[in-house]
């Protein structure tokens, strides 16, 4: 089976609960559509667990990108002194990351060795921007935030980096001509999307035409949602 979740945001408790619920077999695959870290307390623990699992495939989120830009400046030792020694540009990037919820991740980095930080940095750097998956007779394009500046005939490799990371799709938009092709993404909580659509907010997966939004706001007292692509079954913890 092939599964997809997103926006764990440091909720190691939710991550462990999801793994227990799925009981992944070696032949199963779980795609994680970015924003594993930040905001919640234990993003580093989630990443360290993911690194060990060959059948867990990470997709880059904007929070991973922010961390990957900041961590190299802090690799040798994360201390108050090393932070104070940052250049103006680097300090601005670090400040932006912290304002966007990077504090718990930075504290987690302080608790592991430089070697472990380097391993996680390599993991972040090697995350793909998207995956195209065949399951249950359907095609699924998996990204963190949809596809900004969408064009039906545009190849995925021609999109810009931030098109994958910062998009705010309208779930009601029709996209590809192939009605058996679906775009699956996180980034914007489904409660927010539902409110924008004039619906009552709910922390559940939103399916609208060819778009499937799966960020169920687990770090905001919502749920960690997961979709089985083969059966379109929804799992929540």
For each feature predicted by the language model, list its residue ranges.
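N-terminal active-site segment of His-dependent metallophosphoesterases
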Residues: 1-49
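Generic enzyme active-site microenvironment
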Residues: 5, 32-33, 59, 142, ...
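Divalent metal-coordination and catalytic microenvironments
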Residues: 7, 35, 50, 61-62, ...
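Active-site environment of divalent metal-dependent phosphoester hydrolases
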Residues: 9-13, 38-41, 65-68, 187-195, ...
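Short, glycine/charged-enriched secondary-structure capping and boundary segments
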Residues: 17-20, 45-48, 72-75, 156-157, ...
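A general structural motif
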Residues: 25-27, 53-55, 137-138, 179-181
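Active-site neighborhood of divalent metal-dependent phosphoester bond hydrolases
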Residues: 43-47, 51-131, 171
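Acidic, His/Gly-enriched loop-helix segments that form or flank divalent-metal centers
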Residues: 96-213, 217-222, 232-236
């Amino acid at each position: 089976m092939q599964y997809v979740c997103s926006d764990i945001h440091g909720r190691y408790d939710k991550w462990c609960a999801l793994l227990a619920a799925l009981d992944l077999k070696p032949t199963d695959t779980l795609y994680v559509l970015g924003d594993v870290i930040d905001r919640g307390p234990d993003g580093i623990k989630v990443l360290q667990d993911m690194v060990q699992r060959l059948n867990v495939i990470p997709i880059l989120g904007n929070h991973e990108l922010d961390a990957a830009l900041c961590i190299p400046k802090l690799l040798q030792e994360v201390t108050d002194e090393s932070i104070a020694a940052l250049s103006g540009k680097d300090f601005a990037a670090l400040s932006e990351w912290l304002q966007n919820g990077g504090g718990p991740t930075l504290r987690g980095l302080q608790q592991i060795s430089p070697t472990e930080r380097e391993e996680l940095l390599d993991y972040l750097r090697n995350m793909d921007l998207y995956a195209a998956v065949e399951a249950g007779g359907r095609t699924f394009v998996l990204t963190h935030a949809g596809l900004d500046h969408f064009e039906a005939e545009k190849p995925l490799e021609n999109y810009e980096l931030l098109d994958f990371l910062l998009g705010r799709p309208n779930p009601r938009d029709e996209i590809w001509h192939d009605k058996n092709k679906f775009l699956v993404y996180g980034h914007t909580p489904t409660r927010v999307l539902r409110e924008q659509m004039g619906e009552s907010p709910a922390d559940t997966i939103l399916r609208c035409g060819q778009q499937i939004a799966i960020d169920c706001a687990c770090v905001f007292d919502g749920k960690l949602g997961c979709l089985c692509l083969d059966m379109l079954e929804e799992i929540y913890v």
